[in-house]
Amino acid sequence: MAAFVLRRLVQAVLVMLTVAFIAFMLFQYVGDPVTNILGQDATPQQRLQLRADLGLDQPFPVQFARFVGNAARGEFGLSLRQGRKVSSLIAERLPATLELSMLSAVIALVFGISMGVYTALKRGTLLSQTLMTISLLGVSLPPFLIGILLILVFAVTLKWLPSFGRGEVLALGPWTTGMTSLDGWKHLILPAITLAIFQLALIMRLVRAEMLEVLRADYVKFARARGLPDRSVYFGHALKNTLVPVITITGLQLGSLIAFAIITETVFQWPGMGLLFIQAVTFADIPVMAAYLCLIALIFVVINLVVDLLYFAVDPRLRIEKPTGGH
């Protein structure tokens, strides 16, 4: 177990160093931070002084080492567009993105697994066929189109739910949440459903495929031959083994909820990190772009590490010590 965790940690560090290098290259080759800060009318002396202040006159390895050290402390400098610390901007926007992503993940997991099990056990029924058709649409349609359709139906036509913004939020120390008010929930429903639909359909189809394969396994047939009730066979034996490969895919998909919330946040003008990143790209705000890249990579690395540990815990084959020699 310790060796397994150590290998994963080493891999995580290597991945983060690679991402940090890519983010650092943004500062080197995408725009000129001196020009972005001082403008075109700055004198050569002012430009040289600022380059020295920013450490841009130092050797490449020194600059990269300093960048990694600052990134490890969460320091990415000042936003070129807003003139504020990037860390404070991220801290303001992160709660909104996490709140949206976590609710979307719950929706995708609860309904995806439930519907996947149902369509596997009742695959000949009309409802099962209907759910499979709807899931195909969920996988095929792009999120921005789903969001626009939901806005058209529930915000414009029926006027049941708002179409943009986060609504009323409550500050709990550094954290802000909209889940403490009805207005906040109303603003959260449409973007959460939009973000969850693709993941829900993917999880549903994956669970169904794995469930059908497991139900044909010999140990399931043996459990039925022993006279075990269907509930015990389906949920005590089949579903447990179905979730082993599902865990890996689901974990990575949950990470993508945060990484790819950009489109959903843009459609609904949700004040999260995705919208901040789009604004940073529009104005070539390199510090914000670099911070977003590193943070998303860190989230993926952490989720992947947790998924590996869960996989290790669920699948007993991984806990069997490999022989050290011989045949």
Segments from the language model and where they lie:
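Alpha-helical transmembrane segments of integral membrane proteins
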Residues: 2-3, 94-127, 156, 173-327
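Cytoplasmic-entry segments and transmembrane alpha-helices of multi-pass inner-membrane transporters
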Residues: 1-7, 11, 114-150, 244-246
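Hydrophobic alpha-helical transmembrane segments of membrane transport/permease proteins
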Residues: 15-65, 158-180
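Hydrophobic alpha-helical segments of integral membrane proteins
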Residues: 9, 60-76, 86, 90, ...
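An internal, D/E-rich "acidic patch" concept
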Residues: 57-113
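Residue-level recognition of pore/gate-forming positions within transmembrane alpha-helices
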Residues: 12, 20, 43, 108-109, ...
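Hydrophobic alpha-helical transmembrane segments
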Residues: 40-55, 132-144, 190-196, 232-249
